Amino acid sequence: MPGIVTRFAPSPTGFLHIGGARTALFNWLYAKHHGGRFLLRIEDTDRKRSTQEAIDAIIEGLRWLGMSYDGEIVYQSKRIERHKEVANLLVEKGRAYHCYCPEDEVAEKKAKAREEGKIYKHKCTTKPPSCHPSSRHWKNMWSRAGMTSGVRSVVRFKVPDSQEIVIDDKIYGQIKVNSDQLDDIVILRSDNTPTYIFAVVVDDHDAGITDIIRGSDHLTNTFKHLLIYQALDFDIPRFAHVPLIHGEDGNKLSKRHGATSVCDYEKMGILPKAMRNYLLRLGWSHGNDEIISDEQAIEWFNLESIGRSPARLDFKKLEHLNNHYISNMSNEDILTLMLRENTLTDKKKGYLLQGLTELKKRANYLTELLDLAKFYIQDPPLDLSEEAEQIVKSNLDIIKLLASFLSKIGDENWNKGFLSSQIKECAKLHDMKISDVYHSLRAPITGVMDAPGIIDIMVILGKDECIRRLQAI
C-alpha cells in the first residue's frame, strides 16, 4: 500500500500513558510495514491544561520506546491562523455560523438532557439560518436576547438533518449513526482558538495523513470528523479504532491499577524491547507467538489481527517478557544501563560483567537486577540481610577458621574445582557440616542467602577480596 502516512497526536495534558504508547506503536508499525511515514503532532490548543513538562515527557517516552518519527514535530497551537482560515471558509460556504448562545445555558441544557436519559441536540437560538449578522433582524435578535455588540461568539458547524453517517472502520467494520443524534459542532471557541474536533481534521488533511489508528473512545468524534471532511471536500483517510486497555480486573484502566505512564515502567526497570513486545500483544496477535522481535513485528503487523474486545493488563506477562529480554541481553549492554548514574572502578565493573551471567536469569526488572548484584560492588563490611546477620553471629568461629584456611591457597589454584575440593576437605578435617561451611562463606561474602553458587562468586571476586570480606566481620 504505497504512500502510507500515519501519525501520533497526543494532547500534552499529562505524561505518555500506556494506552497512548500502544496507539503510537500501532501507527509506527503500520507505517514501517508499508514503507510509509510516521508523524508526531502535539495537540496543544488547550493552553490552560497543556504543559511543557508533558510535552517533554511524551517526546522522551517515544525516544525511550525506540519509536522515531519522520520530519519535524508539528505543534497544533502554531497552526491557529490556518484553523481560523478554514473555519471562515466554512462560514462563507454556509456550512458554519457564529453562535451567541450563552455557553453556561448550553451546558445546563446538556446536563438536564443527560439526567433525563435524552440526547441534547443544540441548534443556535440566537441566529436565524438566513440572517446575516449585519441585518436589522439579527440586531433585533441580539436585543431580544439581552445581548450587546460586545458579545463574543463561537463558530458552530451546521450538522445536516437526518443524514446517515457511515464509518468503514478497519477493526469494527461498518458503523452508522444518524446526524439527528449530533448537535451543531463548535469548531472555534469564543477566543478564536480551534476545538479538537475541528483542528484535527485540518491538520490531518494538511499533513497528508492516509490512515488514522486511534482508541475506540474517539469513535463518536469520528462521525463529526466525517461531516467536516465532506463539507470541505477533503480526502477522507482510512480509520481504525482500537479497543481500550482495561486493568487486570476488567475495569477501565486507571491509576489504581498501578503504573499507567511509560515513565513509570522505565523507572521500574522495564526494557524498551520488552515494553514494545508487551504493548504489541495488548490486543494484537500473531498465532501463539509471544516473543516477537522488532523485525517480526514490522513484517507481521496488520490491522486485521487486532481484536475487538478490550485488552487486559497482565503484569505477570510483562515480567516474563522483561526477564526474557534481560536474560538474552549482553552483560556489557546491561552494565551500561545499570550504571548510567554510577561510576565504578574497573575492578568492580569486572566483577559485575562476570556475575551478571547468572544474576540476569533471576531478575524480572533492571532495578531488581541492580539490587541482586549490589554485593559485587559493596566494600566490606557488607550490609547484611537479617538472615545473613544471624548466620554471621552464630558462626564467627567458623568464619575466622575459613579466612585462615583460604588464605593459604595459592592464587594459581583459586578456581572452582580446587576451591570446592579444599572446602570439603576443611569441613571434613574440622568435623563441620558442609552446609554450615557454605553458609558461613555466603553470609559475609555476599550479605544475602539467596545469591548464586558461592564458589562461583568467590572465583569472580578473587582470593584477596574474599579474605578481606571474611576478615571484616
UniProtKB/Swiss-Prot annotation:
Keyword Cytoplasm among UniProt keywords: yes
Molecular functions per Gene Ontology: ATP binding; glutamate-tRNA ligase activity; tRNA binding; zinc ion binding
Nucleotide-binding is among the record's keywords: yes
Motif 'HIGH' region: positions: 10-20
Subcellular location: Cytoplasm
Enzyme class: ligase
SUPFAM superfamilies to which the protein is assigned, alphabetical: An anticodon-binding domain of class I aminoacyl-tRNA synthetases, Nucleotidylyl transferase
Keyword set, alphabetical order: Aminoacyl-tRNA synthetase, ATP-binding, Cytoplasm, Ligase, Nucleotide-binding, Protein biosynthesis
Motif ('KMSKS' region): 252-256
GO biological process entries: glutamyl-tRNA aminoacylation
GO cellular component, one term: cytosol
Enzyme nomenclature, EC number: 6.1.1.17
Protein family per UniProt: Belongs to the class-I aminoacyl-tRNA synthetase family. Glutamate--tRNA ligase type 1 subfamily.
Subunit organization: Monomer.
Annotated NCBIfam families: gltX_bact
Physiological role: Catalyzes the attachment of glutamate to tRNA(Glu) in a two-step reaction: glutamate is first activated by ATP to form Glu-AMP and then transferred to the acceptor end of tRNA(Glu).
Name listed for the protein in its UniProt record: Glutamate--tRNA ligase 1
Gene from which this protein is expressed: gltX1
